[in-house]
């Protein structure tokens, strides 16, 4: 005859917690840390050496038009300009913020939800 606690026994004990793997996230066995990527935010990885973030960040003093002129002088069109991944929006001008915002929405469908 079994005890009262036998009613709460787990049928397949290997399906649940195993004492040999306590203490960490063991679902992501292929990498050392969890990586989250959403499809609409995906960008191709850079092939050239990453520049210094300070050199990538545009000055908040300059206007949008002057920065576009500098890019054209360097031979880059405004659509081809690299956009930094981590930026401090508190130091950006309104034009710089709008350019960054629009570049992140590139490729999304134009429907009422996204307007």
From Swiss-Prot:
Pfam families: SPG4. Residues 25-37, 50-66 have a biased composition (Polar residues). It comes from the Eukaryota. Signal peptide: none annotated. Transmembrane segments: none annotated. Disulfide bonds: none annotated. Residues 16-77 are annotated as: Disordered. Present with 259 molecules/cell in log phase SD medium. Stationary phase-essential protein not required for growth on nonfermentable carbon sources. Belongs to the SPG4 family. This is Stationary phase protein 4. The gene is SPG4.
């Amino acid at each position: 005859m079994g005890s009262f606690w036998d009613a709460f026994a787990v049928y397949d004990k290997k399906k649940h917690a195993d004492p040999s793997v306590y203490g960490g996230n063991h679902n992501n066995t292929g990498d050392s840390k969890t990586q989250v990527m959403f499809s609409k935010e995906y960008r191709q990885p850079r092939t050239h050496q990453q520049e210094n973030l300070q050199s990538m960040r545009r000055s908040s003093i300059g206007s949008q038009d002057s920065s576009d002129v500098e890019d054209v002088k360097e031979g880059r069109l405004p659509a081809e300009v690299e956009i930094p991944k981590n930026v401090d929006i508190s130091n950006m001008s309104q034009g710089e913020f709008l350019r960054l915002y629009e570049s992140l929405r590139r490729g999304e469908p134009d429907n009422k939800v996204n307007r």
